[in-house]
Amino acid sequence: MNNKELIKLPAVKRITTFSSATIYRLIDKGEFPKQIKLTERSSAWSLEEIYNWIDQKKDERDGGDS
């Protein structure tokens, strides 16, 4: 996938079904993609990184190595 689309927190929450607190807790633990700081007051996530993270979780569930 070569998707450069950026998404905001509400979309990340919708895609993952996580709360804001869970997303930030996973980021702090290094277990979820970090947001990209766009301006002093605005951040977004790479949609591609979110989908890659989901694919990684599926692989872990299925016993895959990738």
Describe the function of each predicted region.
Residues 43-46, 51:
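C-terminal end-helix/capping segment
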Residues 1-25, 49, 55-57:
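Polyanion-binding surface elements
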Residues 59-66:
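C-terminal secondary-structure termini that scaffold catalytic or DNA-interacting sites
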Residues 15-44:
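Major-groove DNA-recognition helix of helix-turn-helix-type DNA-binding domains
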Residues 43-44, 56-59:
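Short, structured secondary-structure boundary patches
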